[in-house]
């Protein structure tokens, strides 16, 4: 029988950048708490959140145009009252959230009921909810030390960003990945894919395959439109995979967006990368994230409006230029990027956050 007053609500929805850190934490604390998950209808939540977590969803979306600002506030207000009912019904004792639109009404509802909230901010530049609602939270956990400068009115704790458990153990290369001697590239655009990266990369494929690159291309759920069928034993395309940890650990180079989750996965796996920040990210936070790696020589940062077929081909040619070292061929620039990545320290963030959450468990 579950104990009274040991109920944890996780509020996380939308993109993998919000959901995956929350999942990593939930797996660490699930044996101590009765788990409940608050998300948004028709989003990634239903695909990744385990059924045992009692997934609750709201019909809540984020209008993108300024004309809908009033509508946004009305939706937040309406959702706040719905969440108050949920918090009371489930007897929630603590809320953990990772930001995003679902977080705002959840924080307000919890505050009105005097329920403590812990929010985690993965990005270097805080998101809107963290920036304006963080002061209402018991703690704001930050993924990067420098984020503290933007949250002067909040009780911040530097924890790093939690990663899924598989990133902390050695994983073999999946059987479906092309075998061979050529360098292995992982091309991906985050949980939602990246249409522009896909389009430009398709244009470069013929030459890259001829140059003996092995390629795993994660195109995203809504970016599967291929201009032509690509036939090669060295190329595999998938909408999505849950084996990202294994792919990143065993690849030579990652080509990706620069969400906070991806940045921390690259730091953990020590992999060099080409980063193309999402141009419409709020406060340009993806570019700021990418600079963390490019500034130490572990990544090459290129803005989306600058990428082209020529850029991909010339950049990869430069990174994988062979230099003989005592008779043994090496990739001089790639090896240098790998060494630079080793200078970054990865944190066991999930354990830190687990201890903070369980501190509140002891108080009940």
From Swiss-Prot:
Organism: Prochlorococcus marinus (strain MIT 9515)
Homology family: Belongs to the glycosyltransferase 28 family. MurG subfamily.
Keyword DNA damage listed: no
GO terms under cellular component: plasma membrane
Keywords: Cell cycle, Cell division, Cell inner membrane, Cell membrane, Cell shape, Cell wall biogenesis/degradation, Glycosyltransferase, Membrane, Peptidoglycan synthesis, Transferase
Catalytic reaction annotation: di-trans,octa-cis-undecaprenyl diphospho-N-acetyl-alpha-D-muramoyl-L-alanyl-D-glutamyl-meso-2,6-diaminopimeloyl-D-alanyl-D-alanine + UDP-N-acetyl-alpha-D-glucosamine = di-trans,octa-cis-undecaprenyl diphospho-[N-acetyl-alpha-D-glucosaminyl-(1->4)]-N-acetyl-alpha-D-muramoyl-L-alanyl-D-glutamyl-meso-2,6-diaminopimeloyl-D-alanyl-D-alanine + UDP + H(+)
Source superkingdom: Bacteria
Protein name in the entry: UDP-N-acetylglucosamine--N-acetylmuramyl-(pentapeptide) pyrophosphoryl-undecaprenol N-acetylglucosamine transferase
Positions that bind UDP-N-acetyl-alpha-D-glucosamine: 15-17, 123, 164, 191, 286
Organism taxonomic ancestry: Bacteria, Bacillati, Cyanobacteriota, Cyanophyceae, Synechococcales
Main location: membrane
Compartment list: Cell inner membrane
Listed GO biological process terms: carbohydrate metabolic process; cell division; cell wall organization; lipid glycosylation; peptidoglycan biosynthetic process; regulation of cell shape
Topology within the bilayer: Peripheral membrane protein
SUPFAM superfamilies for this protein: UDP-Glycosyltransferase/glycogen phosphorylase
Enzyme Commission code: 2.4.1.227
Function, as annotated: Cell wall formation. Catalyzes the transfer of a GlcNAc subunit on undecaprenyl-pyrophosphoryl-MurNAc-pentapeptide (lipid intermediate I) to form undecaprenyl-pyrophosphoryl-MurNAc-(pentapeptide)GlcNAc (lipid intermediate II).
